[in-house]
Amino acid sequence: MSKLKELPLSALQFYATAPYACSYLDGRMARSQVATPAHLINADVYSRLVRAGFRRSGIFTYRPYCDECHACTPCRVVVDQFVPDRSQRRAWSRHQHLQALVAPLTYVEEHYSLYLLYQSMRHAGGGMDQDSRDQYEQFLLQSRVNSRLVEFREPPGSPEAGRLRMVSMIDVLDDGLSSVYTFYDPLERNASYGTYNILWQIRQTRELGLPHLYLGYWIADSRKMAYKARFRPLQVLTGNHWHAFEDEAGDAASPAPASNRD
């Protein structure tokens, strides 16, 4: 990089939030480190921050900064070495007929309705099922980086042609894709939309000639986050270096069982 291009990153400031209730591990308090100002975090700077363990929520870029707990571990799939297991192959076979449309981040009422339904059935009591349209847009549709929205529908000619099944937000980085958030039809209890979505993103990353799919944070003791260990080979960020997941996780490296959460 030239010095001129490095300026936005060197001009960033980082602050720690006040403690708040952890949304992944009951009874624990969490803190985040937030990068500011947001207008300096362009696609190039954001790619470097993601490699350092940051994520984003809307225009806010953050990473875990807890006082004692270090359960949140950044993880990424090495896509050119990935081989799906049997359950993942079944998920791909079950849903590969879905028609994917990649678009800019755009508000669609049908997407918002599916989001509320998903939150009410998959994360009841978390409060996000009460999100207003403004909250939904701030969370998922505001971005200063290279972001895309992908919707998955039943294809023309099928019994439920055009039915919306899933919506996913992704960021395009200089070394991969970053999976931001996904919500899907929770009424299909035997579906594996979550697994299929990650498989689809792995394939897209590979087709773009990029090496990594960033999946956010792996948390061994959180069922909502431990499933990421099923996508191997996985790398995790510890001590400012990316390592093979198995080398760092020890006994916790045993993949979480598949469930209907996917």
UniProtKB/Swiss-Prot annotation:
Reported function: Functions in the N-end rule pathway of protein degradation where it conjugates Leu from its aminoacyl-tRNA to the N-termini of proteins containing an N-terminal aspartate or glutamate.
Superkingdom of this protein's organism: Bacteria
Annotated localization: Cytoplasm
Keyword rRNA processing: no
Cross-referenced NCBIfam families: PRK01305.1-1, PRK01305.1-3, PRK01305.2-3
Family statement: Belongs to the R-transferase family. Bpt subfamily.
Record bears the keyword Transferase: yes
Protein name: Aspartate/glutamate leucyltransferase
Enzyme superclass (EC): transferase
Protein source organism: Cupriavidus necator (strain ATCC 17699 / DSM 428 / KCTC 22496 / NCIMB 10442 / H16 / Stanier 337)
EC number: 2.3.2.29
Catalytic activity: N-terminal L-glutamyl-[protein] + L-leucyl-tRNA(Leu) = N-terminal L-leucyl-L-glutamyl-[protein] + tRNA(Leu) + H(+); N-terminal L-aspartyl-[protein] + L-leucyl-tRNA(Leu) = N-terminal L-leucyl-L-aspartyl-[protein] + tRNA(Leu) + H(+)
First-listed, main subcellular location of the protein, grouped into a coarse class: cytoplasm
One GO CC term, this protein: cytoplasm
UniProt lineage: Bacteria, Pseudomonadati, Pseudomonadota, Betaproteobacteria, Burkholderiales
Keywords: Acyltransferase, Cytoplasm, Transferase
Gene encoding the protein: bpt
A molecular-function term among this protein's GO annotations: arginyl-tRNA--protein transferase activity
GO biological process, one term: ubiquitin-dependent protein catabolic process via the N-end rule pathway
